Amino acid sequence: MVHAAVADLAKHLGPERVLTGERIPPRYRLDALRAHRGTRLPVAGVRPAAVVVPRSPHDVSSVVRFAREAGFNVVPWGGGTGLMGGARPRDDSIVLDLRRMHRVRSIDRASCTAIAEAGIVLEGLDRRLRRRGLSLGHDPWSRPRATLGGAIGTNGLGYAGYLRGSMGDQVLGLEVVLADGTILRTRAAARSTTGLDLKRLFIGTEGTLGIVTAATIRAFPIPEREDVRSFEIPDFTTGFTAVSRIYDDGLVPSVMELDESFPAPALPWSSDEGPPTLHLGFAGKREVVGASWRGANARLRRSRAKRLPAREARAFWRRRHAIIYHHDEVAPGVTSADRLLANTIFDYAHVALPRSKVLAFRRSALSIVRRHRVAPIGFGTWTQPELVSLEMVRPVRADREEAREAVADAIDEVLRRALALGGSIEYVHGVGVKLTHLLAEELGEGLDLARKVKRALDPAGTLNPGKAGF
């Protein structure tokens, strides 16, 4: 019965755009939540019922209507770079690979806006904008592979997050296919106070309330000057205090990353303990950048920061996207990261905290991780002092599941500590399926309200079930 239904879909859209059975490549079983991560979820993934390649919002609408009537669910797919399992299918899923919907429909240079389809890769969109003297404000580590739709679905954050905001902050209007197949287009005004801001329903909800097919986004004039510098800091507390003062002074960095590293002999690459490193940058008019650096340098001198050679800053900036290439396939369904971390469980926490709680969280989090016999390998703040990341690793010796469980337990306790300090369990990647079990602890009664919204918009549960708490 299922196969007959999918066959009908293939007749409607064309067999070359509907993949089933052995024709479905293994990559559609998983996104970037894989076997080397600290998760209690099944790590093998399952083959979906079908993969469909739409070319228009009307194609998406047809597939959603079909899925709802035939009892399938629909999982949107972009670059496959999601770290939380937001694009994981079930065996009754129709995966919508949106990458053929990659047009830039228009660029308005005077208004500094663009309309682009959800499947366009962020780096390609940035290149198109730069031909018109504009740039994309969203610059995550995954930019060479991630798509616009995925960035909107997770409300992702990039290196310029403090200067430009999250991806959702840059969205003016959306084209969305709802669970009944309706194509909704929200007005792309710079500001409106005419009631509910409908586009916000679909930003950060991971395709569970509607499937984004296109967006009107802000674009930004290419800055006259971009100046990124790197510093060695005596210790993390000193660096954190200096960075906080820079923000208190009203300066607006275009990039900020304060990192400390810990030795991790289990990793297949070197990780040496040493003084924390601060990468800091400003962008804009030359005189504004110069004035910003004069203010920042005054704070850094008081903190005994040592400026590193310019090549260090250039290397940092050049390598900022390098990690994404570990997610490239080296064999069907196998990525470079799968092989690199074959004997290791690796994971991270990305939490938002009140600034006054960051140093207390650091002490607690490092203690928690070590108590679980997991090694912290990095701790830092990114884009602004309140956004904190912690990386950890545990080698696989005899029992891989034991190692994965230890890392998962450490992550959960660290995230609960962030909640106890008034923070949020995730600030950049969404929750997907990986963190859904903690949503009730963060949202409280708000989760019940969110689920009422889900039932109102998608009573059959057609759109990306099991993600984002739904």
Can you annotate each of these PLM segments?
Residues 21-101, 116, 136:
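Glycine-rich N-terminal segment of FAD-binding domains in flavoprotein oxidoreductases
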Residues 182, 432-470:
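Activity-critical C-terminal alpha-helical subdomain
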Residues 103-257, 462-463:
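FAD-binding subdomain of flavoenzyme oxidoreductases
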Residues 1-27, 460:
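A charged N-terminal "starter" segment
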Residues 20-36, 221, 232, 240-413, ...:
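C-terminal substrate-recognition/cap domain of FAD-linked oxidoreductases
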